[in-house]
Structure formats: structure tokens, C-alpha cells
Amino acid sequence: MEHSAAVVVATLILGIFVVKWFAAPKEHPSAQRLPNTQLPSSSNNQQRTAGSSNGRGSQRRVSSTSRRNITPEMIETVRNVIPALHPEQIRYDLESTGSVEQTMERYFNGESFPFPPGYTPARESSANGQHNNIDEPSDIRKRSNIRPDNLLSKFNVDMSVDMSDMSIKELEIDERKKLLVWEARKNMEKRLETDTELASLIK
């Protein structure tokens, strides 16, 4: 009797497990792995977001570091040698070159010096209400009658003296001006050999 009772109990327990197994919902193995496979996508989105924010940050750093520190002394130095240029023209060019020497060399090489975007220079009016600059030549060198010979005499520059071995950082302000004019004249002489349009401006 005891053996029969044990067999009956074992059969009932086995039947319960079989019923639960058939009653449980079956999921495809790929469906069980789906939540795990979605995690890398979320991680990639976070990485892309972080990367784009880092990119914007680096762009801001580049734009901020590209701004040059232009001092009033730099503008005044250029203006003392080239009084025809407006301070805003000088400032705008210095923001590109960052160098007094390069700005002055650009001028003597006949480069254009535009005003900053959005800036309108004030025009002086004469007594009859007309602008003084009407019918004036557009080239700033012609308006101010600035010629290489004028600068040579103004700064007492002797072109027969070789100044190529001088360092501008070791010179006083007056000697720096002489060196800049000397270098600009030498560069202009080289360019005049091939640039007929520029040569016509200083005739």
C-alpha cells in the first residue's frame, strides 16, 4: 500500500510540472535578447551627443583663440607711417595679420584696406554742405599723395644702406619705422618689375 501511495504522489507532482510547462508563454530566444541588443544603441547615442557637444566646445575655443589682441600702440605705429589709413581700417587688417610689419607691407604692396563689415566712415562736410571727398580718387595713396620717395625723406631712410641684417625687436621706435620703410621699398621695387598697374599708381 505504501509503495502504491508513493507512486501516486510522484505521478501527481510530475503531472503538475507538465501542466505548468505547457501553460507557460513561450518566447523566442531572439525576443529575450532584444532588450540587451538595444543597450549599445542607447550608448552610441550618448557618445554621439557627447561628441557633438565636445565639437561645439572645441569650435568655440578655436574661435576665441583666433581673436588677436590689437593694442592702440599697434594702430598708432601704423598710422604714424601711413596717415592716409583710417584707424578702423588699420584695426581690421591687424585682426587678420596680427603684425604691424605685415600690415604695413600689405599697404606698400598695393593691397586693399576695407573697413570692417557694417562700419560706415563719417564724411566731413564743407561750408556749402557738399562732401569734401566728392570726385576724389578712390585709391588712398593718390588721395594722400603718399609715394615711396615721400616716406624715404620723411623718415630719413637711405636706400644705399643695407638694413637686411637688422632685427626690429632690438631697435627703437624711430629706427623701426626706418626699417619698415626700407623693407617695404625693397619689396615694392621687386613687385614693380612685374606689376604695371601698381607702378602706374606711384608715377
Curated annotation (Swiss-Prot):
One of its GO terms (cellular component) is Doa10p ubiquitin ligase complex. Pfam families: CUE, Cue1_U7BR. CDD domains: CUE_Cue1p_like (cd14424). Residues 29-74, 123-144 are annotated as: Disordered. Keywords: Endoplasmic reticulum, Membrane, Transmembrane, Transmembrane helix, Ubl conjugation pathway. The chain crosses the membrane at residues 5-25. PROSITE patterns: CUE. GO terms for molecular function: ubiquitin binding; ubiquitin-protein transferase activator activity. It is found in: Endoplasmic reticulum membrane. The keyword Membrane applies. The keyword Membrane applies. Belongs to the CUE1 family. Forms a heterodimer with UBC7. This is Coupling of ubiquitin conjugation to ER degradation protein 1. The lineage of its organism: Eukaryota, Fungi, Dikarya, Ascomycota, Saccharomycotina.
